[in-house]
C-alpha cells in the first residue's frame, strides 16, 4: 500500500518535531493547572491506588487510564508540542489510537476543539507531536489526556520566547463525581 499521507496531508502523523526554538515544560510545574487526574507513584491516575485496589479488580485495572484528565494554561506560542511518556498503550482492535492514546487540544473558555495530537501507529512508550496555529495570539489552551492509556510524564513545548501563564480556573471549583459506562465516557458509543 502506498503512503496516503503523500496524497492527503490530513493523514500525516508528525513524529519528528523539527522545532529549533522549542522549550519544553513539565506539566507538574507552575503555571499549569491539572484536572481530573493526579500524580501518584510515577503515573497520572484517576483515583488513589489503594482505593482502586479496594473496590474491584476491574477498577484497579482501569484506574490509571487517564480519561477525564486535562491540563490548562495560557500562551501566545504559534504552536503547542507535546512529549508524552506512556508506559502502557491501550491498543484495541475496535478503537482508534487517536482516542485510546491521543491527546486533544482545545482553545478558549468554551474549549473549542482544534486538533488531536495523533500518536504514530507503531507507538510503544510515548510520542511527540505538534499542533500549529496560523498566527501568534493569546490563547487559553486545554489538552485532554488519552482515554485508555497510562501517562507517566507530559511535557508541553512552546516557542521559547512565548509567554506561559496560568489559565483561569473553572467557574465551579467543586468537583463533580459522575459514574457511567464506556458509552457515557464516549469510548464505545
Label each residue range with its predicted role.
Residues 173-189:
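Catalytic nucleophile-elbow at a beta strand-turn-alpha helix junction centered on a G-D-S/GDSL motif
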Amino acid at each position: 500500500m502506498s503512503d496516503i499521507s503523500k496524497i492527503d496531508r490530513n493523514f500525516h502523523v508528525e513524529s519528528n518535531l523539527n522545532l529549533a526554538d522549542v522549550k519544553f515544560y513539565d506539566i507538574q510545574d507552575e503555571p499549569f493547572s491539572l484536572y481530573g487526574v493526579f500524580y501518584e507513584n510515577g503515573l497520572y491516575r484517576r483515583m488513589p491506588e489503594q482505593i482502586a485496589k479496594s473496590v474491584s479488580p476491574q477498577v484497579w485495572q482501569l484506574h490509571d487510564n487517564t480519561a477525564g484528565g486535562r491540563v490548562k494554561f495560557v500562551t501566545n506560542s504559534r504552536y503547542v508540542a507535546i512529549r508524552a511518556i506512556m508506559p502502557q498503550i491501550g491498543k484495541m482492535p475496535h478503537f482508534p489510537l487517536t482516542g485510546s492514546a491521543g491527546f486533544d487540544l482545545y482553545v478558549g473558555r468554551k474549549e473549542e476543539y482544534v486538533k488531536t495530537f495523533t500518536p504514530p501507529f507503531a507507538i510503544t512508550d510515548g510520542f511527540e507531536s505538534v499542533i500549529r496555529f496560523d498566527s501568534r495570539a493569546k490563547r487559553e489552551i486545554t489538552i485532554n489526556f488519552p482515554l485508555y492509556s497510562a501517562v507517566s510524564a507530559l511535557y508541553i513545548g512552546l516557542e521559547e520566547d512565548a509567554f506561559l501563564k496560568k489559565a483561569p480556573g473553572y467557574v465551579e471549583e467543586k468537583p463533580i463525581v459522575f459514574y457511567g459506562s464506556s458509552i457515557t465516557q464516549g469510548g464505545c458509543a
